A protein has these predicted regions:
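N-terminal short leaders/motifs
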Residues: 24-37, 80-85
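Feature targets compositionally biased, intrinsically disordered low-complexity regions
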Residues: 19, 24, 38, 51, ...
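Amphipathic alpha-helical segments enriched in hydrophobic/aromatic residues interleaved with Lys/Arg
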Residues: 2-20, 24, 139-154
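N-terminal, Lys/Arg-enriched amphipathic/low-complexity engagement segments
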Residues: 31-49
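N-terminal regulatory/effector-sensing and dimerization cores
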Residues: 45-152
Length: 154
């Protein structure tokens, strides 16, 4: 899946009734949205780059929780980092609770995801980087990634 398709998924998600986001501005390669939730001042910025990377940043603060739903979203390879705050995710009948300092990786299609974003001490910040499997292989071939990352544990 190319970055344009992933970016279009973000546009569709932000515009959906269940996202909880209000679109602030949108171009062919940049999108900005604000949380609709009273008491929270969260913003999300998404950029699509011709290099094959899509970057999403969410930051802000306030009080309360921010529930959101994602019905279908496909990733090439995606890296998520919670910088501050917490995220409670329900995916495929399983629950995940990443918090500040945690990184998690996703690949492939996500269906019927519900998440609740929770600021810690009034703040929240998260990053999401989506890139192709080919880019991951290139980084590996260039020696940028440790070989141990690619060995399966037995």
């Amino acid at each position: 899946m190319n970055t344009a398709a992933i970016y279009r998924q973000y546009q569709t998600y932000v515009r959906s009734d269940k996202s909880g986001w209000a679109l602030d501005g949108c171009s062919d390669s940049a999108l900005m949205a604000q949380a609709k939730q009273p008491g929270l001042h969260l913003e999300m910025c998404i950029n699509r780059f011709d290099s094959g990377i899509t970057l999403s940043r969410m930051r802000g603060g306030g009080t309360g929780v921010f529930p959101t739903e994602i019905h279908n979203f496909s990733h090439n390879c995606a890296l998520f980092v919670m910088v501050s705050g917490q995220n409670q995710l329900q995916m495929g009948g399983r629950e995940y609770r990443p918090s500040a300092g945690e990184i998690w990786l996703v690949r492939g299609e996500l269906a019927d995801v519900s998440e609740t974003l929770l600021p810690d001490n009034g703040g929240m910040c998260a990053l999401h980087l989506d890139f192709s499997l080919e880019k991951l292989r290139r980084w590996h071939d260039e020696g940028l990634l440790d070989e141990r990352l690619f060995r399966r544990k037995r």
